[in-house]
Amino acid sequence: MADLFWQTSDEGSRDLVLLHGWGLNAEVWRSIEMRCAPHFRLHLVDLPGYGRSQKYGPMNLADMADEVWRYAPENALWLGWSLGGLVASRIALDHQDKVAGLITVASSPHFSAESDWPGIKPEVLHDFEHQLSKDFQRTVERFLALQTLGTDSARQDARLLKSVVLAQPMPSVEVLHVGLEILRTEDLRQPLAELAIPFLRIYGYLDGLVPRKIINILDEKWPRSVSAMMRHAAHAPFISHPDEFVGLLTEFASREVLQGR
């Protein structure tokens, strides 16, 4: 049986599970680890097939969520960034009675654009899938660069993301292909409308991958959820603005979760 990389901190009283995005690994959270420590017991996870969880082959969203859940503490807060937001959302939907709350960061319930839905053009995701087979390294670097565009610290943040990728084993091309396929095809818009646990959605105003237009749409479709906009951030707000980001987490945990819905 494959082993999932799962690292738990010794500090904090409330469990917070952190799920990274496509192509990356749990090292991406080091920028907020010390800031979160007084408030949360952190669980840093490399998703199946990523980073130190190399022994897994490609997995669809449901199987990935099931595998991560096998290692999980009950009554934790779940935070997912980008692709990790879909995994965390699937877990919250499947285990509402054992999840304290859901936080999605720069994520979308459906990443592909449609005529009435803002998102990434499907042909762009197709192009990334095609380019992966031709130039693996450059395609991953290109995707990482898109995540920081527009911020004052874009170059610095892009270098940090690249260092995170290089710090651990790279996912296989097959795992990355399936990850892009999940981004292109999964649609949790309707299921998440029924989610009955505390739910915070964090966005970056400058995000080029998750258009801010979806915020008002989802505010209307998901009235039980709460949205927060970080005005100077892009797709990786916890890297560019860690203090503001952690402030949103602690406020949500104290207001929505500890005090009840």
From Swiss-Prot:
Domain AB hydrolase-1: 16-241
Pathway the protein takes part in: Cofactor biosynthesis; biotin biosynthesis
Catalytic reactions on record: 6-carboxyhexanoyl-[ACP] methyl ester + H2O = 6-carboxyhexanoyl-[ACP] + methanol + H(+)
Keyword NADP annotated: no
Family matches, as InterPro entries: AB_hydrolase_1, AB_hydrolase_fold, BioH, Carboxylesterase_BioH
Binding-site positions, substrate: W22, S82, L83, F143, L144, A145, L146, Q147, H235
Biological process according to GO: biotin biosynthetic process
Active site: S82 (nucleophile), D207, H235
GO molecular-function terms, A-Z: pimelyl-[acyl-carrier protein] methyl ester esterase activity
Domain of life: Bacteria
UniProt-annotated location(s): Cytoplasm
Keyword vocabulary terms for this entry: Biotin biosynthesis, Cytoplasm, Hydrolase, Serine esterase
Enzyme nomenclature, EC number: 3.1.1.85
Top-rank EC class of the record's enzyme: hydrolase
UniProt main location, coarse: cytoplasm
One GO CC term on file: cytoplasm
Quaternary state and interactors: Monomer.
Family assignment from sequence similarity: Belongs to the AB hydrolase superfamily. Carboxylesterase BioH family.
Function: The physiological role of BioH is to remove the methyl group introduced by BioC when the pimeloyl moiety is complete. It allows to synthesize pimeloyl-ACP via the fatty acid synthetic pathway through the hydrolysis of the ester bonds of pimeloyl-ACP esters.
Protein name as it appears in the record: Pimeloyl-[acyl-carrier protein] methyl ester esterase
